[in-house]
Amino acid sequence: MMNYYNDRDSKLIPGKLDGTWWEGGSMFMILIQYWFLTGDTQFNSAVQEGMYWQKGDDDFFPTNYSQYLGNDDQVFWGLAAITAAELNFPEKDGQPSWVSLAQGVFNTQVPRWDTSSCQGGLRWQIWPYQDGYGTKNAISNGGLFQLSARLALYTGNHTYAQWAERIWDWSATTPLLKEKNWNIADSTTTEANCKDHGDWQWTYNYATYISGAAYMYNYVRHSFPFFFFLFFSSVSLSPSSRIFHSPHSIPSTCTDH
């Protein structure tokens, strides 16, 4: 992974991967966890440089990419920042704290909560000229749900928990989170008042909601709805291997993105 990062065409832009922006946040989140679990510090400077370079106005919404980013793109960097805060990843003098960067993402996404359609929810993409503006998807809403839950647990501020519950409750009124069978649809559209759904199944959608539910379960001291979800989501795991399979994954096929 680091060989690819160091050899990329965009290597003069710290934190930017070729052809994609959000995956840089995902990569740094993995490297932060790697440092925490192994004690290996060799990648820490690259993580710090990339995270701070892409922080924009302390909200991971840099002007160079803001015209085409989606809410899901931004939230991955917020999740990387809250991971750094939780694991006490080293900060650099003169730079904002990791938790403040995670809060910056939360503070810019909450005003985008859209009650003009579907009685709530985050749109996938932010600007009306983007193709995904009419879509409300699981990873954007699940991402903000998880970030809110983690900020609640980390800071003790109940406002974050209230937002996590609001996102959960709204998701459950749409195909994005079906409490009857715990199916998580990839997307729904404002044109259909969020009653239709995209049938694609992606494991990161499930993982985002499951992780957020686990943080909320800890925050509210074993709340029944979140326990219920955590218990039944385990049914989706393969009994033989305990691996969560994505029905639409293609075996042995990988790309840079």
Regions picked out by a protein language model, each given a short descriptive name:
Residues M1-H257:
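Glycan-recognition and catalytic cores of secretory/periplasmic carbohydrate-active enzymes
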